[in-house]
Amino acid sequence: MPKRGKKGAVAEDGDELRTEPEAKKSKTAAKKNDKEAAGEGPALYEDPPDQKTSPSGKPATLKICSWNVDGLRAWIKKKGLDWVKEEAPDILCLQETKCSENKLPAELQELPGLSHQYWSAPSDKEGYSGVGLLSRQCPLKVSYGIGEEEHDQEGRVIVAEFDSFVLVTAYVPNAGRGLVRLEYRQRWDEAFRKFLKGLASRKPLVLCGDLNVAHEEIDLRNPKGNKKNAGFTPQERQGFGELLQAVPLADSFRHLYPNTPYAYTFWTYMMNARSKNVGWRLDYFLLSHSLLPALCDSKIRSKALGSDHCPITLYLAL
């Protein structure tokens, strides 16, 4: 996602953390909760222990990770690959790679087991957008884009078909500073929804990536200040809701953790937003409803550094 505060006009709470004298703590305990709800104080998210069995007790057999890396080369320099090696996913999906295929860093070949690698990037915009999909298992079929020329120029979608499901990784367009691309985003949302509905009619679907929208108020720290900003406009939120209903798909994280607050995947580099957890949940694993019995866990790895987004991980028992 473009840098909010540098490239995007997204309101974030810039107040510094306040410390209180011991004598005042008892008097201000109630106020602290109010401040946290308003995005004015520390309210951190702790990723719970991984659940590696399905509701019926089947052990997880597939682990997928997704990460907006905000530039492959910079991410590698920040030790992003070290985290991937430790996490050891079966499939790794990357967004905002900002790298054409002929300039991919050699270090990517060092990833153990992820030898089947697929990349998409704009042909005429070096250093912009781009997605990647790396897998232990060779997919049955791989395709790029959503089949519409207007939407397939920026390297935003890879589709990989496996035996029991289809995986789509996407870097959804940002509505931009001043919402200059909001109309385009709405056209994208409609076309993407139709495309996914067609895929899901043939085989269960997993959609992952930076979907560039915080669906509900619980999904960002400062909802009141962002209702007219990219990523939280009524139009984008409605488009996301229509996607869930029409395809149909389930938000795996909210399916398991419907009321968990402060669970974000993106923080602007500005104003110490990450240390204060002033963030947005923009990255998702969405699943066909037929896959919900196989859902073991949907994780937000908020402590993993290397980008302005953190990685997310999905466990399925297929």
Curated annotation (Swiss-Prot):
Bias (Basic and acidic residues) ranges: 16-38
UniProt-listed Enzyme Commission number(s): 3.1.11.2, 3.1.21.-
Catalytic activity: a deoxyribonucleotide-2'-deoxyribose-5'-monophosphate-DNA + H2O = a 5'-end 2'-deoxyribose-5'-monophosphate-DNA + a 3'-end 2'-deoxyribonucleotide-DNA + H(+); Exonucleolytic cleavage in the 3'- to 5'-direction to yield nucleoside 5'-phosphates; a 3'-end 2'-deoxyribonucleotide-3'-phosphoglycolate-DNA + H2O = 2-phosphoglycolate + a 3'-end 2'-deoxyribonucleotide-DNA + H(+); a 3'-end 2'-deoxyribonucleotide-8-oxoguanine-DNA + H2O = 8-oxo-dGMP + a 3'-end 2'-deoxyribonucleotide-DNA + H(+)
Record-listed Mg(2+) 1 binding positions: D70, E96, D308
Co-factor remark: Probably binds two magnesium or manganese ions per subunit.
Modified residues (N6-acetyllysine): K6, K7, K27, K31, K32, K35, K197
Domain of life: Eukaryota
Top EC group: hydrolase
Positions occupied by motif Nuclear localization signal (NLS): 8-13
Signal peptide range: none
Modification sites for Phosphothreonine: T233
Modified residues (Phosphoserine): S54
Residues modified as S-nitrosocysteine: C65, C93, C310
Activity regulation info: NPM1 stimulates endodeoxyribonuclease activity on double-stranded DNA with AP sites, but inhibits endoribonuclease activity on single-stranded RNA containing AP sites.
A single Gene Ontology CC term: nucleoplasm
Catalytic residues of the enzyme: Y171, D210 (proton donor/acceptor)
PTM: Phosphorylated. Phosphorylation by kinase PKC or casein kinase CK2 results in enhanced redox activity that stimulates binding of the FOS/JUN AP-1 complex to its cognate binding site. AP-endodeoxyribonuclease activity is not affected by CK2-mediated phosphorylation. Phosphorylation of Thr-233 by CDK5 in response to MPP(+)/MPTP (1-methyl-4-phenylpyridinium) reduces AP-endodeoxyribonuclease activity resulting in accumulation of DNA damage and contributing to neuronal death.
Quaternary structure and partners: Monomer. Homodimer; disulfide-linked. Component of the SET complex, composed of at least APEX1, SET, ANP32A, HMGB2, NME1 and TREX1. Associates with the dimer XRCC5/XRCC6 in a DNA-dependent manner. Interacts with SIRT1; the interaction is increased in the context of genotoxic stress. Interacts with HDAC1, HDAC2 and HDAC3; the interactions are not dependent on the APEX1 acetylation status. Interacts with XRCC1; the interaction is induced by SIRT1 and increased with the APEX1 acetylated form.
Job of this protein: Multifunctional protein that plays a central role in the cellular response to oxidative stress. The two major activities of APEX1 are DNA repair and redox regulation of transcriptional factors. Functions as an apurinic/apyrimidinic (AP) endodeoxyribonuclease in the base excision repair (BER) pathway of DNA lesions induced by oxidative and alkylating agents. Initiates repair of AP sites in DNA by catalyzing hydrolytic incision of the phosphodiester backbone immediately adjacent to the damage, generating a single-strand break with 5'-deoxyribose phosphate and 3'-hydroxyl ends.
Protein name: DNA repair nuclease/redox regulator APEX1
Gene field: APEX1
